[in-house]
Amino acid sequence: MSQTTLPERVLEWTQKYCDSLTENYKQHSVRMHENYTSDWSKQQLESIKNGTANLTNFVVKNGRKYYKIMQREFDTFQDRNEWREGSVHAFVDKNTGEVYKPASYNSPAKYVRFDMRIINQRERLHDPTFTGWAGGYLYLR
């Protein structure tokens, strides 16, 4: 029987965290388009519901000490039609699962915001109704 190590679990938890953020953005987009009656909004809503919309999503980038949670957007400017990485959403310590708000593109802020080793904090990060794609939940309270 093979036991998974903490760093392996942290990677799995981090991927679920990205999935939660992506789902939160999808729910936000649906709510936004449901409030408008224009034909464009109806088309966007339909493409979201049938899965063909190129919505913003979140991916894990592997760093030396941290996993970097990156926001990706689909760029259609001048017919580029490619995914482009935008801003950093959060940093996750690869060995401990501690989640940090970004201070800059390359470094996390000073204090731990969440710890994925603690079950209730991990469950909150994996809940799309708790996480916010814009990152407001990462501010200290």
Regions found by a protein language model. Give the residues of each.
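Cysteine/selenocysteine-centered motifs that mediate thiol-based redox chemistry or coordinate metal-sulfur cofactors
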Residues: F130-R141
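Hydrophobic transmembrane signal anchors and adjacent membrane-proximal interface regions, especially
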Residues: V30, S38, Y100-P102, F114-M116, ...
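A short, surface-exposed interaction/processing loop segment used at functional sites
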Residues: T96-P128
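Long, terminal "pre-/pro-" and other extracytoplasmic accessory regions
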Residues: T4-T5, L11, A109-K110, Y139-R141
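Exposed beta-strand-loop-beta-strand "reactive/processing" segments of non-cytosolic proteins
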Residues: S47-A90
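Negatively charged, low-complexity tracts enriched in Asp/Glu with abundant Ser/Thr
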Residues: S2-V59
